[in-house]
């Protein structure tokens, strides 16, 4: 017991010393941290933020980054709702980008959709108070993917009532279609002259080198004509040759020498100049003598005509052949025969090279599509024809599906995987879009939409629909192949295909949305429920 009493104070003393040392060490470290925080705040802040910049990305950030980079692929595990949200965000982003690009001055050089040409892409050739003539830019000028359309151009002219486009000939074959109003077209050859009356939907071929002039005989309606031009001499370029001289162009007679003209007409040059080429002094004297306010030369290539002149020009004109067999030279109407596709949502008319001798050697087909408001032309593709489509009337939107060119990727040393791309654009009157062969397309009409199509390389072209109850190539696949091709079972695939009971044209609204709208209308009409 005595020994225990002696050791206990010693033990207490040792424990006290250890406690004091621990407290001293703690205070020293605390002061060091305080000094560090006050002396080096920047380094401390960097240490705090550095791990955050290097932290792994969340799935949401990965999806957003893929959307910014334009990647079409999804994360491996996504619900149906996430996929729908992904598509909706992508579509909204693409539409915003297209709208912003269309307002940019460098839009033509960096446009994301090289297959769409709005009405501003036309170049005006002639314009006066009576009308205008304009031509669309070359298709291969936008992208080399359309280089096979290098030798095809679109020309449009519009003229007011009671006007005439002066005679001319061109080094190009023309296939023209009337999209508004009425026209009387006269084609002149060395041995005869033939006049034709054309109405809405009528088409006519004007061979290269044929002199022609176009009259708008109507008293009220404007005339609108669209022509497909196929140049003869230089691919992609054609020229109009006028025998008359106006403020817009010179007569081709003015290109000959004085001696040649005198020998040609067996007349003095001064007389030739006064009658054919025009002389400013002589012209002014004639105007004063006749009391005219303005001569035809001052008006340009589109001039006014009197009612008496219109009666003479239309006296012997022939009309289109209607449902009769198309003639070798006369006009034909695109809607004269029964549509090849038709239901309550729209009609599709087509004239193929084997059915019309005028376009047979050109290997061109013509189509006319009527899509009613709120309807959809179901997805389909053409086997070999390239279609140039002109919006004649209405508004809508189209979606075209293509594949990124893998060969061009190799040329540009890109290592991106092959991917599907969607090219879409809103459509309005005067717009033009191209449908390459093999590219699936669908068209949605927000108002009654009328489309004129020129099919290039059209002989034996086949139109393959990807949905609908008829002419559906997906439906024709073997049952076993369907199971191997798609993730769903054969029963699910068959049920999905049969859900669309319409063919060629259908309602643009999904079935669920149609049902909800019907219920909404029924609810608005019904009585108010009691609480």
Swiss-Prot record:
Residues 316-337 have a biased composition (Polar residues). Residues 115-273, 332-494 form the Cupin type-1 domain. Residues 31-108 form a propeptide. InterPro entries: Cupin_1, RmlC-like_jellyroll, RmlC_Cupin_sf, Seed_Storage-Functional. The keyword Zinc does not apply. Residues 37-51, 79-99, 286-302 have a biased composition (Basic and acidic residues). It holds the Pfam family Cupin_1. It comes from the Eukaryota. Keywords: Allergen, Glycoprotein, Seed storage protein, Signal, Storage protein. CDD domains: cupin_7S_vicilin-like_C (cd02245), cupin_7S_vicilin-like_N (cd02244). Glycans are attached at residue 444. Residues 1-30 form the signal peptide. Residues 37-124, 283-302, 314-337, 508-531 are annotated as: Disordered. One of its GO terms (molecular function) is nutrient reservoir activity. The keyword Hydrolase does not apply. The initial characterization of blad was made on a seed storage protein extract containing both conglutin beta 1 and 2. Belongs to the 7S seed storage protein family. Seed storage protein. Accumulates during seed development and is hydrolyzed after germination to provide a carbon and nitrogen source for the developing seedling. This is Conglutin beta 1.
């Amino acid at each position: 017991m005595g020994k225990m009493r002696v050791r206990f104070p010693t033990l207490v003393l040792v424990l006290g010393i250890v406690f004091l040392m621990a407290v001293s060490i703690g205070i020293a470290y605390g002061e060091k941290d305080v000094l560090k925080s006050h002396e080096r705040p920047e380094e401390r802040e960097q240490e705090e933020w550095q791990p955050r910049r290097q932290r792994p990305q969340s799935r949401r950030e990965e999806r957003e980054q893929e959307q910014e980079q334009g990647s079409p692929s999804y994360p491996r595990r996504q619900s149906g709702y996430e996929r729908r949200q992904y598509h909706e965000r992508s579509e909204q982003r693409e539409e915003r980008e297209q709208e912003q690009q269309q307002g940019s001055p460098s839009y033509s050089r960096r446009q994301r959709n090289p297959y769409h040409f709005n009405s501003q892409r036309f170049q005006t050739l002639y314009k006066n108070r009576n009308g205008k003539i304009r031509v669309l830019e070359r298709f291969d000028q936008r992208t080399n993917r359309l280089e096979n359309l290098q030798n095809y151009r679109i020309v449009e002219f519009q003229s007011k009532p009671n006007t005439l486009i002066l005679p001319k000939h061109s080094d190009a074959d023309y296939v023209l279609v009337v999209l508004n109003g009425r026209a009387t077209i006269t084609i002149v050859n060395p041995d005869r002259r033939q006049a034709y009356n054309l109405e809405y939907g009528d088409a006519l071929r004007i061979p290269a080198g044929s002199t022609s002039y176009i009259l708008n005989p109507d008293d009220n309606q404007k005339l609108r004509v669209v022509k497909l031009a196929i140049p003869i001499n230089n691919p992609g370029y054609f020229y109009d040759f006028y025998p008359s001289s106006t403020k817009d162009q010179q007569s081709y007679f003015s290109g000959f020498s004085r001696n040649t003209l005198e020998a040609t007409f067996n007349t003095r040059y001064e007389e030739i100049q006064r009658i054919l080429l025009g002389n400013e002094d002589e012209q002014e004297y004639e105007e004063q003598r006749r009391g005219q306010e303005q001569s035809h030369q001052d008006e340009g290539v589109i001039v006014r005509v009197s009612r008496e002149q219109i009666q003479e020009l239309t006296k012997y004109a022939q009309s289109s052949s209607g449902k009769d067999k198309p003639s070798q030279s006369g006009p034909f109407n695109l809607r004269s025969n029964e549509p090849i596709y038709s239901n309550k949502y729209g009609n599709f008319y087509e004239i193929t090279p084997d059915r019309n001798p005028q376009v047979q050697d050109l290997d061109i087909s013509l189509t006319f599509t009527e899509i009613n408001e709120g309807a959809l032309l179901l997805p389909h593709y053409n086997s070999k024809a390239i279609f140039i489509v002109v919006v004649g009337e209405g508004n809508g939107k189209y979606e075209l599906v293509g594949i990124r060119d893998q060969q061009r990727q190799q040329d540009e040393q890109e290592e991106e995987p092959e991917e599907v791309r969607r090219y879409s654009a809103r459509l309005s009157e005067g717009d033009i879009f191209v449908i390459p062969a093999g590219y699936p397309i669908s068209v949605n009409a927000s108002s009654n939409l009328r489309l004129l199509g020129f099919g290039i390389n059209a002989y034996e072209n086949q139109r393959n629909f990807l949905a609908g109850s008829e002419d559906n190539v997906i439906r024709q696949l073997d049952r076993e192949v369907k199971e191997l091709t798609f993730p769903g079972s054969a029963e699910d695939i068959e049920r999905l295909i049969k859900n669309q009971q319409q063919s060629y044209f259908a309602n643009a609204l999904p079935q669920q949305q149609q049902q909800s709208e019907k219920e909404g209308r029924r609810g608005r009409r019904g009585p108010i429920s009691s609480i």
